[in-house]
């Protein structure tokens, strides 16, 4: 039986508190019931950045919300994402600010490269919308303080995409450890992955479908290198 007391706002609060690698992994039964509710009661979501992690989230969002607007500086990503995850019905924007200003959006996913996270999240909250922001939410301590201040000023919800920590399996493992069901903890092992290695890469002109200047945003401008763009941006430093 569908719970008539579940509103879009309540769904958004639940939605902001649960997230796995594909978001859907830890939906509650109440949230799952949203799939059977009227389309008018489903949250309307905008997605900024339409690369790999946004695709993962889109699969999890399907039973919970409707993707109604998308933005990306790569036209190819924009069109593919719309066709695959929004049935070609989402509004498309090349500038994220236009998506933020679009009416009828309840929450916005920020799935861009790291250096854009804080700027976009702040703009979204100041526009009166809630945010799901991929990790890392910030790159510096000062950015974190600024983000916290804006959250308090606006009263908006900001959920950071620490999907593993939110998953039921991970939370069960933590509970087992805390209760000593696994025995006394004697050692903690932490592994930090490393990126790929390679020689110096050649620069080239950016493809016509990519706004390279906007991709770089507020970072120092550098020549385009195909191997350092999109999903590979974290592995290389000057």
Residue spans for each PLM region:
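Pocket-flanking alpha-helical
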Residues: 55-57, 78-80, 97-98, 118-123, ...
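Conserved SAM-binding strand-loop segment of SAM-dependent methyltransferases
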Residues: 90-95
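N-terminal Rossmann-like dinucleotide-binding module
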Residues: 15-86, 167
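Predominantly a Rossmann-like dinucleotide-binding segment in NAD(P)-dependent oxidoreductases
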Residues: 49, 53, 154-159, 164-238
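N-terminal secretory signal peptides and thylakoid transit peptides that target proteins
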Residues: 2-19
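Alpha-helix C-terminal capping/helix-to-coil transition sites in glycosyltransferase folds
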Residues: 102-104
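N-terminal Rossmann-like NAD(P) cofactor-binding module of classical short-chain dehydrogenase/reductase
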Residues: 108-109
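Beta-strand-loop-alpha-helix segment that lines the small-molecule cofactor/substrate pocket
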Residues: 113-114, 118-166, 180
